[in-house]
Amino acid sequence: MLRKLLFFLTFFITGVTLSAQKNVKSVFVSGEEGHKSYRIPAIIALPNGHLLAFAEGRVNHAGDFGDVNIVLKISKDKGATWSKLQTVVDYDKLQAGNPAPVVDLTDPEYPKGRIFLFYNTGNNHEGEVRKGNGYREVWYKTSVDGGNTWSDEVNITTQVHRPYQPQINPAYNFKEDWRSYANTPGHAMQFESGKYKGRIFVAANHSEGNPKPQFTDYFAHGFYTDDHGKTFHLSQTVNIPGSNESTAAPLADDR
């Protein structure tokens, strides 16, 4: 009996695995569609069931810095097939990355929903940015037609970042001296109920001041909007040195 049970379980698990493998779709394939590598994916679903898959499209290599675009593919059949690749953000030969998309479903001006795509740009390698030899900025774009077209970019760096780079921009004059900066990885989120209903929240991380051993100059934080992107605010910094690659999910008690 035990042998029969083990055989059944093995057959069942193998069958499920093979069945799942048949449904696997490669959305982004390194070396195809103009990019050597794709990293940092994020996927969201629209109210109509369409899926939007974002990623960093790294043009020349798999490294974090360089000619990096934010690209998108859309599926209208629950992931069975995908559209051709669309470039949503192209920061010339520099880096645009860390896509954090979310659908705002609570704005009365957009009853069908409005997509926000938050992202970062950078002009140097992370190690150099940590030394103060470069800077990171925070932006967003929106779409009201399911990701087919996108708005102009909006720079929200002064609201959600604390850089000390007045030689770049007089407004980047914060004593906190945040340097490296990255959203997520993964999508942003919107609270669906409770006292924060409608709030859009983006998890992020940053480094503070000069580099420290074991990357203890890094800390997690978040930023949010309660008015559909008109203004943004910083959350408290998580006081855990070395915290990085932040993500967030709502809890049952509305936090």
What are the language-model segments listed below?
Residues 1-22:
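Bacterial Sec-dependent N-terminal signal peptides
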Residues 21-255:
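Asp-box/BNR beta-propeller blade signature and adjacent active/binding-site loops
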